[in-house]
């Protein structure tokens, strides 16, 4: 819960001034957004802040994803702003994306004056109603006296339990109204995690100790527990698989890592899971892209499911032990009760299945191919690099091939699968981590969704490198149509050729077309080493596929492809 500590100096604020004051009190250093008439009072107050830097995005969706990039890399709530009407509706996709991926955001929008709500005033939309299904919580502030509690509650809610976005819609007259406040809310803090029973921990430990073929299944909810996750895996010798959102929780080359499961996961991993007699599921929600046909997923396995969100327990698969709690808190009590076991027979079976179902990486040494490019880029940077992706084939190729070795290194749109995520998220990551290199893997379809944010990267001279795999197509759509639809490919290829090099140069980015370089690896190293933003372009054959692939509606063992 929020701290009960208070300060007792009476102060006079406009609503807008209080908002900025409160953000400063929360330690917010960067706010991103686009101003408009209904939020100009807040921007007027923000202009006087010596603590908060404003990043002017080129589109409100870009602002939302920039905020996500900041929040995903440090786990703290980040703030985005927009005006009413189109400003608010342009934010919707980025906020919905944050909701599905459990990202703590504070979204502040202006609204028409309270007396005009419901009159179809200029740039009026029902922001409160629109945002109900896509936020963890939302507010329409009708009176200035509500602001202190609303702001404090918003920050607490965004970061407590399962994190998520909170939307605060503030009419313009509330922003300009004046009030005096004597007792200012102290810094908002996370609410305490739910308590859990010792009996459930003992039951879970007994199941792990008795299991012959256990698998540790990690989802995005383990993001704050990397040390204990690894300790559990290593002590109990648990083969460990990860969802798309959990990649990096165990280093790619760790001997217990099975890599990613599911639709485009490691072929052997999907078969190994079918042999499991116990699944220890931490912070995962049994997403359909991860488990395939539900009734055929791990049919012989008992399930221990730990998640901070009660709604996820039993929603898709019924657990034998369900624990609603913070994963790190649970592991702190569980690990001492878990026996160290070699599990030699199980590891031999895992190794046999990995040999039977290998995971080849074609053209791994060719920097002008999909996998080869990813490997070549990885060779140019150290383990501190932050990786973002857009959504499509390039996303899956990167998930399969890039050596992800640490939490919060990998930023991708998992639940909503939003094209246009990668570049603004990379900008946010670079703003929050100015000493780290940020690599954004994108495709031509995705990059065009928020290409205008190249201007934001350029203006702020951020060390963001865009690696563009250009197949002049919507690659995953092209793949699914060619594989599973009788009429073949339709509306998935672009007839015109876009000169991305000229576009990037026009925004002020350095550029490199690897197809025109005599030594692509050397050219790649040289441009990645340069400070500032850059576009690296490679042409990819539109017929390239992401394999293996679980067909829509199929079981994970019904994979197709090489």
Regions found by a protein language model. Name each.
Residues 16-19, 24, 28, 37, ...:
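Active-site diphosphate/adenylate-binding microenvironment
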Residues 172-199, 346, 357:
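Aromatic-enriched
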Residues 29-30, 72-82, 88-109, 132-184, ...:
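Structural signature of the thiamine diphosphate
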């Amino acid at each position: 819960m929020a701290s009960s500590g208070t300060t007792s100096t009476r102060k006079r604020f406009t609503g807008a001034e209080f908002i900025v004051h409160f953000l400063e009190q929360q330690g917010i250093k960067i706010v991103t957004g686009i101003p408009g008439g209904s939020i100009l009072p807040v921007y007027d107050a923000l202009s006087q802040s010596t603590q908060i830097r404003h990043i002017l995005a080129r589109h409100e969706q870009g602002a939302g994803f920039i905020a996500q990039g900041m929040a995903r890399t440090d786990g703290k709530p980040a703030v985005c702003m927009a005006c009413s009407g189109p400003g608010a509706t342009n934010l919707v996709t980025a906020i919905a994306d944050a909701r599905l991926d459990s990202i703590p955001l504070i979204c502040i929008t202006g609204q028409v004056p309270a007396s005009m709500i419901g009159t179809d005033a200029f740039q009026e939309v029902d922001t409160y109603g629109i945002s109900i299904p896509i936020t963890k919580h939302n507010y329409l502030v009708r009176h200035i006296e509500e602001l202190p509690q609303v702001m404090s509650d918003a920050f607490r809610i965004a970061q407590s339990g399962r994190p998520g976005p909170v939307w605060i819609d503030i009419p313009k007259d509330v922003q300009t109204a004046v009030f005096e406040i004597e007792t200012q809310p102290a810094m908002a803090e996370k609410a305490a995690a739910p308590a859990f029973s010792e009996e459930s921990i003992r039951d879970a430990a007994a199941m792990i100790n008795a299991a012959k073929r256990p698998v540790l299944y990690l989802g995005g909810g383990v993001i704050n527990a990397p040390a204990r996750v690894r300790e559990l895996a290593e002590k109990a010798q648990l083969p460990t698989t990860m969802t798309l959102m959990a990649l990096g929780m165990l280093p790619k080359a760790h001997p217990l890592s099975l890599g990613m499961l599911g639709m485009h996961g490691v072929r052997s991993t999907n078969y190994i899971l079918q042999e499991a007699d116990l699944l220890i599921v931490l912070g995962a929600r049994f997403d359909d892209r991860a488990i395939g046909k539900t009734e055929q997923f791990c049919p012989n396995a008992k399930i221990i499911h730990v998640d901070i969100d009660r709604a996820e327990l039993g929603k898709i698969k019924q657990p034998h032990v369900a624990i609603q709690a913070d994963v790190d808190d649970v592991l702190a009590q569980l690990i001492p009760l878990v026996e160290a076991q070699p599990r030699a027979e199980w590891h031999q079976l895992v190794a046999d299945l990995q040999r039977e179902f290998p995971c080849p990486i074609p053209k791994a040494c060719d920097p002008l191919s999909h996998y080869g490019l990813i490997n070549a880029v990885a060779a140019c940077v150290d383990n501190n690099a932050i990786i973002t992706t857009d959504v499509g084939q390039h996303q899956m190729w990167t998930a399969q091939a890039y050596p992800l070795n640490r939490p919060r290194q990998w930023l991708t749109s998992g639940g909503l699968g939003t094209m246009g995520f990668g570049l603004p998220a990379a900008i946010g990551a670079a703003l929050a981590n100015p000493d780290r290199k940020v690599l954004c893997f994108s495709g031509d379809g995705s990059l065009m969704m928020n290409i205008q944010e190249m201007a934001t990267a350029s203006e702020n001279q951020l060390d963001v490198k865009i690696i563009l795999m250009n197949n002049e197509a919507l690659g995953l759509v092209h793949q699914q149509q060619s594989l599973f639809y009788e009429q073949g490919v339709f509306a998935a290829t672009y007839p015109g050729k876009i000169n991305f090099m000229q576009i990037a140069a026009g925004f002020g980015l350095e550029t490199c077309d690897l197809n025109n370089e005599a030594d692509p690896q050397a050219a790649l190293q040289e441009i990645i080493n340069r400070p500032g933003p850059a576009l690296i372009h490679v042409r990819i054959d539109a017929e390239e596929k992401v394999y293996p692939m679980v067909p829509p509606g199929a079981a994970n063992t019904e994979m197709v492809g090489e």
